[in-house]
């Protein structure tokens, strides 16, 4: 006899017919991405910020944050409404933790055949992307003086040397299972959660506040009753179904 479905997943299973109808009948939602660009200076000059983050949703700037002094420098209009939420606070807390971790690693980094033009500065792009088919992709890119040195694929935990000067850096970080796990979890768990929150917020802003009123006794139009908006479809595909 087949095992009964867990009560925890029944609400998710209940939406599958609607999801499949939307997939076949109304087209697929676009992919979406969330990027965090860190700039970490090992020995900053007087007045320089040692840690700054520039963030983008779908390649549009939404946050500039000094993670050294815990100060929001600027944010987009839509994000102002998220500022006082728990999710926003958790995001800033994690960005500070990432900045501190990167600073510690930078202090102990040995680069070969590379002379920085100024104070040793690490530029890091951490990103998570939800593709149109619901696949979540996480990655890290590490650069010095604007030149790519090292890549990390969070999905398969693979390190790739782009610049020969990063060979020792790659060997050291690859052996550090704690660091590898940290990078994977931030980009695949935390970043994914933040992207979900931003998409949900944007979805609420774009959807009408109330459905069209209808005369009593009239059947609800099929397009309303059985389809999902692209935003709803993407959120379900990327953030709900993977947990089934």
From Swiss-Prot:
One GO term of the biological process aspect: positive regulation of T cell mediated cytotoxicity
Disulphide bond pairs: 51-67, 128-191
Keyword Lipoprotein carried by entry: yes
Gene Ontology MF: a single term: natural killer cell lectin-like receptor binding
GO cellular component: external side of plasma membrane; extracellular space; plasma membrane
Glycan attachment positions: 37
Lipidation, GPI-anchor amidated glycine type: 217
Positions of the UniProt region annotated as MHC class I alpha-1 like: 30-118
Chain positions listed as propeptide in the UniProt record: 218-244
Topology in the lipid bilayer: Lipid-anchor; GPI-anchor
Region (MHC class I alpha-2 like): 119-209
Keywords: Cell membrane, Disulfide bond, Glycoprotein, GPI-anchor, Host-virus interaction, Immunity, Lipoprotein, Membrane, Signal
Family annotation (Pfam families): MHC_I
Localisation per UniProt entry: Cell membrane
Main location, first listed in the record: membrane
Signal peptide from the UniProt entry: 1-29
SUPFAM superfamilies registered for this protein in UniProt: MHC antigen-recognition domain
Complex and partners: Interacts with KLRK1/NKG2D. Does not bind to beta2-microglobulin. (Microbial infection) In CMV-infected cells, interacts with the viral glycoprotein UL16 and UL142; this interaction causes ULBP3 retention in the endoplasmic reticulum and cis-Golgi and prevents binding to and activation of KLRK1/NKG2D, providing CMV with an immune evasion mechanism.
PANTHER family, per database record: MHC CLASS I-RELATED, UL16-BINDING PROTEIN 3
Family: Belongs to the MHC class I family.
Primary role: Binds and activates the KLRK1/NKG2D receptor, mediating natural killer cell cytotoxicity.
Note: UL16-binding proteins (ULBPs) are unusual members of the extended MHC class I superfamily. They do not contain the alpha 3 domain and lack a transmembrane domain.
Protein name, as recorded: UL16-binding protein 3
Organism of this sequence: Homo sapiens
Gene from which this protein is expressed: ULBP3
């Amino acid at each position: 006899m087949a095992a009964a479905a867990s009560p925890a997943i029944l609400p998710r299973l209940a939406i599958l017919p609607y999801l499949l109808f939307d997939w076949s009948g109304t087209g697929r939602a676009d992919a979406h991405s969330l990027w965090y660009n860190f700039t970490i200076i090992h020995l900053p000059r007087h007045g320089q910020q040692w840690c700054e983050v520039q963030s983008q949703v779908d390649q549009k700037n939404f946050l500039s944050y000094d993670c050294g002094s815990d100060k929001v420098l600027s944010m987009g209009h839509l994000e102002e409404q998220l500022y006082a939420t728990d999710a926003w606070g958790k995001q800033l807390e994690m960005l500070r933790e990432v900045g501190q971790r990167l600073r510690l690693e930078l202090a102990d980094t040995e680069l070969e055949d590379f002379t920085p033009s100024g104070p040793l500065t690490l530029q890091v792009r951490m990103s998570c992307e939800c593709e149109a088919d619901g696949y979540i992709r996480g990655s890290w890119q590490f650069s010095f003086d604007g030149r790519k040195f090292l890549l990390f694929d969070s999905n398969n935990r693979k390190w790739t040397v782009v610049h020969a000067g990063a060979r020792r850096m790659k060997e050291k970080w690859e052996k550090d299972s704690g660091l590898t796990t940290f990078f994977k979890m931030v980009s695949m768990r935390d970043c994914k959660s933040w992207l979900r929150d931003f998409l949900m917020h944007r979805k609420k802003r774009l959807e009408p506040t109330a459905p069209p009123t209808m005369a009593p006794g009239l059947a609800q139009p099929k397009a309303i009753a059985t389809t999902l908006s692209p935003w709803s479809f993407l959120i379900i595909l990327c953030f709900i179904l993977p947990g089934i």
